[in-house]
Amino acid sequence: MRHYEIVFLVHPDQSEQVPAMVERYTNLITEDGGQVHRLEDWGRRQLAYPINKIHKAHYVLMNIECSDSVLSELNDTFRYNDAIIRNLVIRRKEAVTDVSPIKASEGREDRRSAPQREERNHDNSDEVSEESED
């Protein structure tokens, strides 16, 4: 079995269907003895350029290990599913389990914004307590 990295973009109107789609694809992979090494839901993001007058899409990244027959079945599923706008399959030499740079940058942004929110909350609470003391 070979290792693959798959990214697919789902139409923004179908974002609610993403968990069911991912579950269907992971079942397809694991039923044949394959493995899902990494699965990341990047959420709805801006596209670099419009595709069929669509400016945003829901991104999903999967790193899998599967047979050629499962991969061709996945490609057919992507091709005939109208909800999937684009997909990319890349063969990898080994399994990738690290957090992707996009997901890591989201984590850093969350960590940066959390202290700022806490500072704002503390500042606001100080103002409120000062007002109540008067």
Swiss-Prot record:
Domain of life assignment: Bacteria
Keywords: Ribonucleoprotein, Ribosomal protein, RNA-binding, rRNA-binding
Membrane-spanning residues: none
GO-annotated biological processes: translation
GO CC, one annotated term: cytosolic small ribosomal subunit
GO molecular function, one term: small ribosomal subunit rRNA binding
Record Gene3D superfamilies: 3.30.70.60
One Pfam family it belongs to: Ribosomal_S6
Record carries keyword Transport: no
Region: Disordered, residue numbers: 97-134
Residue ranges, compositional bias (Basic and acidic residues): 105-125
InterPro entries assigned: Ribosomal_bS6, Ribosomal_bS6_CS, Ribosomal_bS6_sf, Ribosomal_S6_plastid/chlpt, Transl_elong_EF1B/ribsomal_bS6
Family (UniProt): Belongs to the bacterial ribosomal protein bS6 family.
HAMAP family from the UniProt entry: Ribosomal_bS6
Primary role: Binds together with bS18 to 16S ribosomal RNA.
Protein name stated in the entry: Small ribosomal subunit protein bS6
Organism: Marinomonas sp. (strain MWYL1)
Higher taxonomy: Bacteria, Pseudomonadati, Pseudomonadota, Gammaproteobacteria, Oceanospirillales
Gene expressing this chain: rpsF
